[in-house]
Regions:
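Flexible loop/turn segments at secondary-structure boundaries
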Residues: 1, 24-28, 106-110, 145-148, ...
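Active-site neighborhoods of metal-dependent hydrolases
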Residues: 1-130
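Short, well-ordered loop/turn and helix-capping segments at boundaries between secondary-structure elements
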Residues: 8-12, 125-128, 143, 147, ...
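A glycine-rich phosphate-binding loop feature that marks nucleotide/adenosyl-phosphate handling sites
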Residues: 20-28, 141-142, 161-165
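Acidic, glycine-enriched loop/beta-strand segments at the rims
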Residues: 80-83, 89, 134-138, 146-183
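C-terminal cap of metal-dependent C-N hydrolases
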Residues: 90-97, 102-103, 165-212
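Feature representing long, continuous alpha-helical segments
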Residues: 99-100, 117-121, 125, 139, ...
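Short, solvent-exposed cationic patches
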Residues: 214-217
């Protein structure tokens, strides 16, 4: 229903787009509005779909008692919630108006593997399996978000653009981040250049001081 709404807006000339990541669970703080009254009914689930990412209950699925205790005493605690449907995520990632996003949240190295794994995972599990073409995947990771944010010097290889380049092996690239080890680097990404400077080699950071944050658009 949501994607049909996006299609309707786009057909009427509105620049509507959205992003998605290639995982079937989301992550947020246990105190977020996502878990406000009615969430169990909305997701048609029980408390055991929620896994705690940190603290004394790290790695455990919730009971009602644990959920209420942590939400009351530590609302910032990160969780992973296993309620997303594979068919819905796959449909979204094949939609022409959807960009790839990591939506990365990390707290002391704990959190969701999407922060480290989204981009190599898309190439491994969607391109190599034929769900997306390599062109489509690269576009939704580069040109689409750059265009959406108005970053005219980003997202493409052309004269005058910033020399931000990722060199990867499409046959080897894959993610290794898991819900137990969410920061594990992938493989098959040989080089990353930011502004023409080497930032990473073989999925390992060489320089972490390159680039700059986008404060205002």
């Amino acid at each position: 229903a949501f994607l049909r709404m996006v299609d309707s807006y786009r057909m009427n000339g509105l620049r509507v787009s959205c992003d998605c990541y290639p995982y079937y669970a989301f992550s947020t703080a246990i105190g977020s509005t996502t878990y406000d009254e009615g969430w169990l009914e909305r997701y048609h689930c029980g408390y055991d779909v929620v896994e705690l990412c940190e603290g004394r209950y790290k790695g455990r699925r919730c009971t009602r008692e644990i959920f209420e205790e942590v939400r009351r005493d530590w609302p910032e605690c990160l969780t992973v919630c296993y309620v997303m449907q594979e068919s819905d995520v796959d449909m979204a990632l094949r939609h022409p108006g959807v960009m790839l996003g990591s939506d990365g949240i990390m707290n002391g190295g704990q959190g969701h593997p999407r922060a480290a794994g989204s981009f190599p995972r898309l190439l491994a599990q969607f391109v190599r399996t034929g769900k997306l073409s390599l062109y489509e995947a690269v576009r939704m990771m580069t040109a689409m978000p750059a265009d959406k944010l108005g970053l005219s010097n980003k997202g493409s290889l052309q004269v005058g653009a910033d020399a931000d380049v990722v060199i990867f092996d499409p046959d080897r690239v894959r993610d290794h981040a898991t819900f137990d080890q969410p920061t594990s680097p992938g493989e098959g990404i040989d080089y990353v250049f930011i502004g023409g400077e080497l930032a990473a080699r073989d999925c390992r950071v060489v320089r972490g001081d390159l680039g700059r944050s986008v404060r205002k658009l």
